[in-house]
Swiss-Prot record:
One of its GO terms (cellular component) is mitochondrial inner membrane. Disulfide bonds: none annotated. It comes from Homo sapiens. GO terms for biological process: 2-oxoglutarate metabolic process; tricarboxylic acid cycle. The modification Phosphoserine is found at residues 49, 61, 90. The keyword Iron does not apply. The gene is KGD4. It is found in: Mitochondrion. Belongs to the alpha-ketoglutarate dehydrogenase component 4 family. The modification N6-succinyllysine is found at residue 5. GO terms for molecular function: protein-macromolecule adaptor activity. The lineage of its organism: Eukaryota, Metazoa, Chordata, Craniata, Vertebrata. Its main location: mitochondrion. This is Alpha-ketoglutarate dehydrogenase component 4.
């Protein structure tokens, strides 16, 4: 019993160093927030209204609306195996959803 008390009394207490993050992020308060439309134009993506206007004009590419995003994302989706792809929604199911359920 006496030996364990002596061992614990002779232990050295270590000082814990304060945490210093390895990743430095820029100060967000200094940077003004860009307008959403400006950010889309600078990224080269079509704005939401232009996609809608293309669809209303009868565009021949329904895949454009289905796979919105960068072109590489659309290519990845096309190469996915069938079990990982989104199930297509039938016209009847779309109408059911638009109605809000059974009549």
């Amino acid at each position: 019993m006496m030996g364990s008390k002596m061992a614990s009394a002779s232990r050295v207490v270590q000082v814990v160093k304060p945490h210093t993050p390895l990743i430095r992020f820029p100060d967000r308060r200094d940077n003004p927030k860009p307008n959403v439309s400006e950010a889309l134009r600078s990224a080269g993506l079509p704005s939401h209204s232009s996609v809608i206007s293309q669809h209303s004009k009868g565009s021949k590419s329904p895949d454009l609306l289905m796979y919105q995003g960068p072109p590489d994302t659309a290519e990845i989706i096309k190469t996915l195996p069938q079990k990982y792809r989104r199930k297509l929604v039938s016209q009847e199911e779309m109408e059911f959803i638009q109605r809000g359920g059974p009549e």
